[in-house]
Amino acid sequence: MKSLTYFVVILLIFSSITAIGIDKNAGTTEQSPKKEITVFRTFLQPKIYEKDSFFELHVEGMNNNIFIPGQPMLPVHTETIVLPFGVKIIDIECEVQNIESIILSQKIYPAPQRIIIGKSISSDIPLMDETVYNSNKFFPDNWFDFYVGVGLDDNNKHASLLTINTYPFRYNPMSNTVKYVKNINLKIDYYDPSINIFPETSTYDLVIIAPPEFTGDLQRLVDHKNNIGIKTVMQTTDEIYSQYSGVDKPEMIKYFIKDSLENWGVKYVLLVGGLNNLIWANPREDRNYGARDWRIPVRYSNLLDSEPGYVSDLYYADIYKESGEFDNWDSNDDGIFAYHKGFSLKNDELDLYPDVSLGRLPCRNNNEVKSVVDKIIHYENNADPSWFNKMIVVSGDGFLDQENLDFEWDTNGLPTGQYTIFAQSINPEGISGPIDETIVTLDKTQDTKLTFNHDDYLIVPNFPQYPASPVAKIMSVSNGDILGKDDYLYKPGEGEAYCNSYYGYANVEYRDEILHIRGKTYDPKPYGYTTNISVWIKNSEGVIVFEDQRNHSLMYYEGEWATGEQMLHERAGALYYMPEDFTSEILWTSNGKWTGQSDVINSMNEGSGFVFFSGHGSPRTWGDQYPGIPGNRRIGSVTGLANVALSSPFFPMNKLTNDYKNPIVIVGGCHNSMFNITLLTTLLDQRGTKSTWCYGIPTPEGWSEWLTRLPKIGAIATIGNTGLGFGVLGEWCTVGGVDGWITTEFFNQYGTEGYEILGEVHKQCITNYIDTFGKRDSSDIQTVQGWILFGDPSLMIGGYDTN
């Protein structure tokens, strides 16, 4: 997010004027004169491309798209204007010039769905939002929209953040008409705040909040920070509770943090404490918070679209909302914090921009405190590029984004007999894979018998060794099946064909004597995203009775694009953004370098500055899938790293030997950073009804907290999701928001934008995410709320160079 320079432009011809008025009296004083900014934008005519019987609009100079799932994916220009902290926007006037229109012959392509990572996909996922596509109104409703937040600018200064989305293209789905403008002029009127509530110089940079029982072991960290020039103070929870009031203990702590910003000029807040027991502890008093069994209490989000709440430490960092007011995360004062469910009028309006860089060390006892303090001090005092300047990435194929091939073989008029269906795929390099053969009987006197199969792993030579030649597999009919006298339809569920509910690529269908031949085609190698597949059918005499092909069939291995170094739709994977002096070790399922935990552990044992896992997770394990997910997830999955296992070694993380060569770990997936579990709460949740996400496997601590608190070994810090993670299938996996966007943004902020302090990188990722995607979809809200930093927010990445 960069500050912009603006100039006033006088327009001579206006075609349309729109103004949004706001309460002009609220938050203003006679000492705050009205100010004005005018922004002028010029847009080029769109280029139209056909895609899957839809149209896509591409326009040079646009930096975003509408990514609200199922709604028309129109180009957007998004910009964030940095204004003084606490400004009051009066109104924004939009003037447009030169409106033109074009009529399309096909619908605009819908924005991709956000899929819960690792969870079965609902069969009612709408590919198109019918409320929009069946409407006779232009979408979006206006040529622009905006939202105002309060957070930190590029220089870590408190500011108001005005994000404006301009929509030069608006679409009427009923008439299939696109209106577009060449010029948009925005005039913004606002009042400056009358006073600055923050000190010019900081008394303290870092405040550590901890229970009294941890202060003795934390004093070493306080002394260390002060010695290296990070002015640090420690405050106990008991002291805070005795001095502050609030509806509960989390709010008392939040008020203390607010005072720390306004009185001391604090930049970083470190919370030290998790649950108080590994065996059993009560994770929450009610739907809003947990305190009694917590060293440091937690706030739960009540975003209920996907799960019954999750811990959000963003609550402690998001202090202010528009006009600089305190944001208590209960905007409608109904006593339910951070409530969100669908499009309910009861949803709380949240700012979500962090106003301070905040992290947590979720220690449960003094031994864990000693371990993490020891690692932090050693890390910052012993910078060593020989092991730090290396990045490890681990990933595979996140989703089975197979297109619906749907070859239609019309058997009308064909004689009874045996027929052999052949399929073969070829990649752009001209390499052909093995031929898949399926023998069926055509006999209209018999009952139809069709069976689904998913055994493409049998086609891959030496499975699971990769890379391999292209794969073609017919799934909707099997050897020995009978095409008979009656119709047949079967839709395999997620347990048989992952993501089939979304694509329908595996549906078994025989109707009106037409067999719909469906299956998979993919190229199992790094970045092998396109293949051509040919299908032909011979009768018992070897005569071809049917042949067809599908060209440029796409399948993306989402996690590999997120972690890799190539560009996709003008956004690259993590390695692309890293400094040139960094080396990389790429552990992908498609390159054959990741086949199990030993590959990951051996690589981490050598030490590295960063490890990026992008895939599927839970509180006890992380993994992903082989390319194409052969045999579906049960066969096609591979474990990357677990804290608890059912066979030896029972605690795989403990096998790490990377003493004091501790990486910053970014993990993409569900619940890896969930830290409100214990051994008994997970053991007793056999069916998952208590949402511990371990399904009866006793897990005393979550994946990220375990990796972070290990003595000497493991991570120096971990960033991941406390709740469900979301992903985007296929080609928009790095651009379309949620997990694939925010995780790669970390490396953009560190490697390209140059942020060196851990908490500032984390804070900037959340800020940029909200700038780019806003807060309209619940998956966007959950992405930023649940993305927690386990580590010291004031940590100098790589340590301090003593020279």
Where are these regions (language model features)?
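Aromatic/hydrophobic beta-strand junction motif of beta-rich domains
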Residues: 409, 461, 517-523
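Structural beta-strand segments of beta-rich domains
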Residues: 511-517
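Solvent-exposed loop/turn segments flanking beta-strands in beta-repeat/beta-sandwich domains
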Residues: 524-537
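Extracellular and select intracellular beta-sandwich modules with Ser/Thr-enriched
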Residues: 432-438, 446, 529-531
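Short, solvent-exposed loop/turn segments at the edges of extracellular beta-sandwich modules
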Residues: 426-431, 524
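Surface-exposed, short loops/turns at beta-strand junctions within beta-sandwich domains
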Residues: 412-417
